[in-house]
Amino acid sequence: MKRVAIIGAGAAGCFCAALLREWAPELSVTVFEAGAKPMAKLAITGGGRCNLTNDFQGIQSLAEAYPRGERVMKRALKVFSQEDAIAWFTAHGVPCVLQEDHCWFPQSQDAMDVVRALQRAMRGADVRLNTKVISICHSFVVKTPQDDNPFDYVVVTTGGAPKGLPFLEGLELELVPPVPSLFTFTVKDAALNALTGLVLEAQMSLQGTSFKAQGPLLITDWGFSGPATLKLSSYAARHLAETGYKGTLAVNWLCANEEEVRGWLQRSASAHPQKLVSSVHPVQQRLWDYLLAKAGLREGLRWAELGSKGLNRLTAVLTHDTYPLSGKSKFREEFVTAGGVALSNIGLNTLESKQYPGLFFAGEVLDIDAITGGFNLQAAWSTGYVCAESILKCTRT
């Protein structure tokens, strides 16, 4: 009987175990998990609702969703796509619904339904909780504090946190240092922070770089959050880690260029010369008042009094409003890192180690990560599937 070890009982590891149990019940599958519960992160992702995947219709390219790991994901999605993921979970008792933002969720909006479906599918696997793997030797003996276990195949699915990687050190694999890749921005601006809860579509960029993102922007009492912020944090993850999470953020509040904004302001001045500038606003009133003050425009100013200098200042604030970045804050619903096992170590079609045939990697332990919106979980499903399929082929050749 061939023996398979899966190290890490997260989404990728449990999905891989479930597939192996369904496809090849004759295999012995052992799942090692250092924590007290399997799929603990999955149970709380998406605010406990579990954003299973995305329909990929809201992105222009795969690199937009996967800043790191696009090549692997292009191959993995051909093997197990987002449609395949929805079909699998539906067939396993988790009907799914698609939201307007392109995100797929369980119809019940309960992540535990996903957890329970995976637990049912992987029934028969030996799941060892509170069992930390200390090392893996070249002959695939998995060492734990309790005992040493020989295996024919090993799948590493420990996630991207640095604490999940030390047991790989003896294999001398190339590891990309992990850094946070989904977080919010800390901006110390009392007047801005007073606008807490305000949301609008905006463009964000990191001044002096090519990193930029567009989407709903949420103003918080500590700075910026929301999809636009999270996308930018993902795209610029390694750059920001290197700079100590310092820099200058630029916000385009209207998602329009200077010429377009200037034209709108001029038309407003022509159409409403005697109205107050504060009374005709392209954004929410509270934000508009804040931006007028930031542009140095006095209260009670009429459109006829705006003048060319006022027009220039207001155009600049609306299209390129800058804020010193003073740090990052954890995004509570996502725990994602950039980094992990370098993709140069593995076969891109099989996710098998080039140095150690029979050793596979899936999920966030690889140097693959994505923006928010279900893309990271899809990476777990797709890479877990590729590993299970690769092992099955190995056992039957």
Give residue spans per PLM region.
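N-terminal Rossmann-like FAD-binding beta1-loop-alpha1 element of flavoenzymes
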Residues: K2-V31, C387-L392
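Short hydrophobic core segments
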Residues: A5-I7, F32, V133, N149-A161, ...
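Glycine-rich FAD pyrophosphate-binding loop
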Residues: R21-G47
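Residue-level recognition of phosphate/Mg2+-coordinating polar/acidic sites
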Residues: E22-W23, K37, G58-S61, K78, ...
